[in-house]
């Protein structure tokens, strides 16, 4: 299937590693011109090098900017004033009991996980509407529906992303622009890898045993019974960004390995 992305420009926030990097690679493989973003020039340069090795003739460019701040977004937009596809992937997470989460953490999580996408979408949507074609995708999580008690502030931001995506989709109804969110499940990203390795060392067991333990206790409802790969999530994002996915609009697309115990 031809995704129809040749000649399209795609911005992927927070794309030097993990799900964001995998999405950048998937879009580049489909012929899109991909803008890679990270906070430091070093990480961006490494990501570009890896992408060019992974995807033959990849058309990629990097822009270092902290999109978790208004100033960082403004600097980024000066260099990349328009795009056809926007993937709001930037996000942070942290395990912390509710009673220990200060106001500053709530505000920081909201600004990075939610406002980064709001600011980018607010800028890029008018250009998409003018061309009558565009794709906006928010990378959310199953935590949007099943708020994790060990990081309620993170879950709050994932729910907010779904709400923003649905509202934006309704605001551009009847146009060639679609806005969706993807609810990813527990994924073998850089952060998850650090967590698993740390727990394995603490308990003196293998990483495979920690993964099995995680899915038997923390996410027992998972049908996949393992961490998703970043490429599995990226494949969903690439299709939603495609010209073939016009009928998918305003949706919270579940790609969470069956963790959410609901048929709808």
Show the residue positions of the predicted features.
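Catalytic Tyr-X3-Lys loop
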Residues: 84, 92, 99-118, 133, ...
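Conserved glycine-rich cofactor-binding loop
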Residues: 9, 16-17
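Active-site helix of classical SDR
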Residues: 121, 157, 165
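Short, small/polar-rich loop/turn modules that mediate ligand/substrate recognition or access, typified
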Residues: 173, 178, 248-250
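Residue(s) in the substrate-gating loop at a strand-loop-helix junction
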Residues: 141
């Amino acid at each position: 299937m031809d995704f129809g992305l040749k000649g399209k420009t795609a911005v992927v926030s927070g794309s030097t590693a993990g799900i964001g990097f995998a999405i950048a690679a998937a879009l580049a493989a489909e012929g899109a011109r991909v803008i890679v973003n990270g906070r430091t020039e070093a990480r961006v340069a490494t990501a570009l090098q890896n992408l060019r090795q992974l995807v033959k003739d990849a058309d990629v460019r990097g822009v270092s900017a902290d999109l978790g701040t208004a100033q960082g977004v403004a600097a980024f937009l000066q260099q990349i004033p328009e795009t056809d596809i926007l993937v709001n992937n930037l996000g942070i997470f942290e395990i912390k009991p509710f009673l220990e989460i200060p106001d500053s953490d709530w505000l920081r999580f909201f600004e990075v996980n939610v406002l980064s996408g709001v600011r980018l979408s607010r800028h890029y949507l008018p250009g998409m509407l003018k061309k009558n074609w565009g794709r906006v995708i928010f990378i959310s999580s199953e935590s949007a529906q099943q708020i994790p008690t060990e990081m309620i502030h993170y879950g709050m931001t994932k729910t907010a992303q779904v709400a923003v995506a649905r509202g934006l989709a309704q605001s551009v109804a009847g146009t060639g622009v679609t806005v969706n969110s993807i609810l990813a499940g527990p994924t073998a990203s850089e952060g998850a890898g650090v967590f698993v390795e740390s727990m394995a060392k603490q308990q003196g067991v293998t990483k495979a045993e920690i993964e099995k333990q995680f899915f038997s206790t923390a996410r027992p409802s998972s049908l996949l019974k393992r961490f998703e790969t970043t490429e599995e999530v990226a494949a969903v994002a690439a299709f939603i960004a495609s010209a073939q996915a016009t009928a998918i609009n305003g949706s919270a697309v579940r790609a969470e390995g069956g963790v959410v115990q609901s048929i709808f």
